[in-house]
């Protein structure tokens, strides 16, 4: 019922102990971050359920924007923060938030609500849960169901990237082929790395890419450098790192996390601008890898 045995391929890499601990051990969450971990566990002699739960002192890093709610709550005389958040920090990826059998969800929800009330927190929020969880919990204990949008690519039985292209209109096929030719025709070498193919030095380079992206408009680099060291140590087999090299020097990269049947694209950055390289590394290389 829990995420998975350590070392096994998780359905969702973001709710594994190793991912959440990488955030905490690296200082990306914890004291001073506005994300204070308060995980819930459910036991029946042995662990039978868990929930990633955080006391939040702000709304940053959630990718669900409730600042208007916070302002309205405080204009009415209340204090919106701290609040209680069921979520994976900095990760707007849909996945299970109730790590238990369906019949045990209500026990975890009751415990989270009790924690909210006992600590006089303003509210309880559950973000990016599965559709099944949302439907099962809507209306329970006054929970309001809010729907947002995401874009997911699905493999409809494709054996090759060409099969995928053949499923598109002629205009879109030509556009993607042209973009790939542009990105791949500039003398760069593109490598998709996972597991022991990833070297510690690759993270030094990717950290610079991550910082560059975070420094741009609307960007916020929530992760610390130590986070990348932690995931290299504990979950590099769950990572696909796509890098573009100019000779021996990496000039751009995209970081993906590998689930049991899903590839999750998360971060991108570069030290040089090259036409169409963002699309190549973040989308087309990832789709290629997922199909293979």
Which role fits each region the language model picked out?
Residues 1-72, 113-117, 122-275:
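A conserved beta-strand-loop-helix scaffold within acyl/acetyltransferase catalytic domains
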Residues 54-97:
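Conserved acyl-donor/pantetheine-binding loop and adjacent beta-alpha core of acyl/acetyltransferases
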Residues 88, 92, 102-106, 110, ...:
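Short, amphipathic alpha-helical segments
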């Amino acid at each position: 019922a829990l995420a998975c045995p350590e070392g096994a391929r998780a359905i969702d890499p973001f709710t594994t102990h190793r991912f959440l601990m990488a955030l905490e051990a690296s200082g990306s969450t914890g004291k001073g971050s506005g994300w204070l971990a308060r995980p819930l566990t459910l036991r029946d002699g042995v662990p039978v359920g868990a929930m990633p739960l955080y006391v939040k002192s702000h709304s940053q890093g959630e990718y669900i924007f409730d600042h208007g709610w916070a302002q309205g709550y405080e204009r009415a005389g209340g204090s919106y923060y701290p609040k209680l958040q069921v979520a994976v920090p900095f990760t707007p990826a849909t996945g299970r938030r109730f790590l238990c059998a369906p019949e045990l969800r209500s026990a975890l929800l009751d415990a989270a609500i009790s924690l909210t009330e006992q600590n006089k927190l303003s509210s309880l929020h559950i973000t990016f849960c599965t559709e099944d969880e949302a439907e099962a919990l809507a209306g329970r204990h006054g929970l309001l169901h809010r729907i947002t949008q995401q874009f997911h690519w699905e493999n409809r039985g494709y054996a090759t990237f060409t099969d995928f292209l053949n499923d598109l209109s002629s205009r879109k096929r030509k556009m993607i082929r042209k973009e790939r030719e542009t990105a791949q025709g500039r003398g760069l070498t593109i490598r998709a790395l996972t597991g022991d193919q990833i070297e510690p030095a690759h993270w030094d380079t990717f950290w610079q890419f991550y910082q560059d992206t975070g420094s741009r408009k609307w960007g916020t680099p929530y992760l610390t450098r130590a986070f990348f060291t932690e995931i290299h140590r504990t979950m590099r087999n769950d990572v696909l790192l796509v890098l573009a090299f100019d000779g021996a020097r990496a000039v751009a990269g995209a970081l993906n996390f590998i689930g049991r049947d899903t590839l999750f694209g998360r971060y991108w950055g570069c030290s040089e601008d090259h036409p169409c390289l963002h699309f190549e590394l973040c989308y087309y290389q990832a789709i290629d890898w997922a199909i293979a």
